[in-house]
Regions:
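Acidic, mature catalytic/reactive cores of soluble proteins
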Residues: 1-371
Length: 371
């Protein structure tokens, strides 16, 4: 019995339908992920009617949820999602116009991070809506799809107009030193992961004909990022979000990559996942909300993807094996409580499903080529 078979036996018992082939595992989790896509093309963060509010569409989550379909060359699904995202921006173009003319003072004046997947309306309650990285990641992906993967997303002058306004929006914000709530939607700081997402987005979208990005806009981001790294922010030394600068954005040099990976593995890797940062209160199991941080499942897939891209096969396979142990019959949870087998209700988490599919695909594809 292979190691993969043993892992699935321990999870599912002795049932005949245990998926022991990696292609079957991918099919199973792709099916779970597809259930989260709505008619509009947008993905929910988690299952419908979940009490946590994760039955909404986040810009950032849709960026990561689409990655699985990209690696499997399902461009129809990818295009449908990004066409829907463009429609969101068009619906709220008046707000973008206002923000371009004068820098927003309050979080509600920023482009919001989450939307009703059917009406594309904003949710107005306070949710740390100041998330510059969510704009950076969308610019990055549209630029990558258009200029590198040759997948047409921008279809007419209205599309080009709204994308140009997103560039101008980041310029007005002065994203390189604009405090935001970041990937985790929490306290406002200047986050390296947010500055890096915007920088990567601007560098990629400038390759699309018809979109203008001033060189100074990129230079400002590069200088700011250089000053912050290897930290995530003034208050956070190491953070799971920093992995995004290695993959998918790939905007760091080798020394920076190695230092971030070393810090993440030493300080944040746990048994069932990767904690976001030390002192994370979200789903913290301890009454003091300090010392027992929740363990996020997609951290293992993220590390596997990075090590596969860096050519470190053994490390990539090791993190894939860790992620396989996190699977449940419902799919992959958002997180496990510290030092336990209990996971939270955001199961499946679309982001985790997509990262797992991508990691399993790339690691096994490489292994098969080498045989």
């Amino acid at each position: 019995m292979t190691a993969l078979q043993k892992i699935f036996k321990s999870i599912f018992g002795e049932k005949e339908e245990i998926p022991i082939d990696y292609n079957e595992i991918i099919k199973q989790h792709l099916k779970i992920l597809k259930r989260l896509q709505t008619k509009s093309g947008l993905f929910l963060a988690s299952k419908k009617n979940v009490d946590t509010g994760y039955d909404k569409a986040w810009l950032r989550d849709n960026f990561y949820e689409c990655i699985a379909f990209e690696v499997l060359n399902d461009w129809t699904t990818v295009k449908k999602t990004y066409r829907a995202i463009l429609e969101i921006f068009k619906k709220h173009e008046y707000k973008i116009d206002y923000a371009i003319t004068r820098k927003p003072e309050y979080p509600h004046q920023y482009i919001h991070a989450r939307y009703n997947p059917e009406t594309f309306d904003e949710f107005w309650e306070e949710w740390g809506n100041k998330q510059n990285d969510s704009i950076g990641c969308i610019l990055f992906k549209i630029g990558e799809l258009e200029s590198i993967k040759k997948v047409k997303i921008l279809e007419d002058e209205n599309d080009y107009r709204i994308v140009q306004k997103l560039v101008d929006y980041l310029s007005t914000l002065e994203y390189w030193h604009d405090p935001d709530s970041g990937m985790w939607e929490e306290n406002q700081e200047v986050h390296a992961s947010s500055v890096g997402a915007c920088l990567a987005g601007l560098k990629m979208i400038k390759n699309v004909g018809g979109i203008k990005v001033r060189s100074q806009l990129i230079k400002n981001g590069e200088e700011a990022l250089r000053k912050i790294l290897p930290r995530e922010s003034e208050k956070k030394f190491v953070d799971l979000a920093l992995l995004s600068l290695i993959w998918p954005y790939n905007i760091l040099n080798e020394e920076q990559k190695n230092e971030i990976l070393k810090n993440v593995e030493y300080h944040l890797v746990r048994k069932r996942g990767v904690i976001r940062y030390k002192g994370d209160h979200y789903y913290n199991k301890n009454q003091d909300n300090f010392s027992e941080e929740a363990e996020w499942t997609f951290g293992f897939s993220w590390l596997a993807l990075i090590y596969e891209m860096l050519g470190k096969k053994n490390k990539a396979e090791n993190f894939i094996k860790k992620e396989l142990k996190d699977l449940t019959k419902e799919g992959i949870p958002e997180l496990y409580y510290s030092n336990s087998d209990k996971y939270n209700e955001n199961t499946p988490l679309g982001w985790s499903e997509s990262m797992f599919i991508a990691a399993l695909y790339y690691v096994n594809k490489k292994s098969m080529r080498e045989k």
